[in-house]
Amino acid sequence: MKITFLGTGGGRFSAISQRRMTGGFRIDNLNGKNYHVDPGPGALVRTYQFGFDPRNLDGVFVSHAHTDHYNDAEILIEAMTRGMTNKSVLDGYERWGPGISKYHQSHSKKYVLEPNQVENINGCSVKGTKTVHGDPEGVGFQIDYRGFKISYTSDTGYFEDLHKYHEGADILIASVLRPGNKSIRGHLCSRNFIELLKEVKPKLAIMTHFGLKMLSIDPIDEAKRITKETGVKTLAAFDGMSFEVNTQNPARIRIKTL
């Protein structure tokens, strides 16, 4: 199993400026299947840039109906046969979405997840996780393959029970928009992430989806500080970062730059 980050920028200003790419990330060879998670602006181009073929996708995960998460979903759906998402991306909710046209929906198998709802997909259990964000129908995801769990918070503010949705995660991937205590509604800052890691205690934590304030410092230094404070190995993802998942010892990885 391999995880590759096709973009690590987050929020509208990072997406517009492209100081970091916004292509989301891929999970490849998960029980022999390949998935793209939150394909924001440029995801298709970055797919080819980093040596992948979108026609080999088996699924697309879209957490919510904000452009930096769903922008390239339609063109990826053109290239594959299944889509996985949340309700507002497909149906819309008040002023959010829909992000996927009826035409593209008709050409893929759809799974709509809500918090704690579980779907069995290609030999994996996929659970929706609660988020507190601008899109009230948004979700994160926890993928369970033979007891090995990868959790993704997507965009969410910190709330008291957040850790319960990501309980048991071996790898926790989180959208951490801002450094230090610089919290903003609907997003995690480093302080929030530290609290979450102390509660979930994953074997490996990865920060991504960086806003301009995070990028104005060095996210790598921020990750080192978080590692020291929590005892959880924490990485700051970068564009083109790729690694094979070590299911026996997730914290022991060899990172490649594509």
Please place each PLM-identified region on the residue numbering.
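Cap/insert and terminal regions of metallo-dependent hydrolase folds
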Residues: 159-242
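Conserved beta-strand hairpin/beta-sheet module of binuclear metal-dependent hydrolase folds
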Residues: 1-50, 137-154, 171
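Active-site metal-binding motif and surrounding structural segment of the metallo-beta-lactamase
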Residues: 41-91, 170-172
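Structured loop/turn residues at beta-strand edges in well-structured enzyme cores
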Residues: 52-55, 122-124, 167, 200
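Metallo-beta-lactamase
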Residues: 85-139, 145-146, 246, 253-255
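A short helix->loop->beta-strand "cap" motif at the edges of active sites that frequently abuts
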Residues: 82-93, 200-205, 232
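Binuclear metal-dependent phosphoesterase catalytic core
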Residues: 233-258
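Active-site neighborhood of phospho(di)ester-bond hydrolases with catalytic His/Asp-centered motifs
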Residues: 36-40, 58-68, 151-156, 172-176, ...
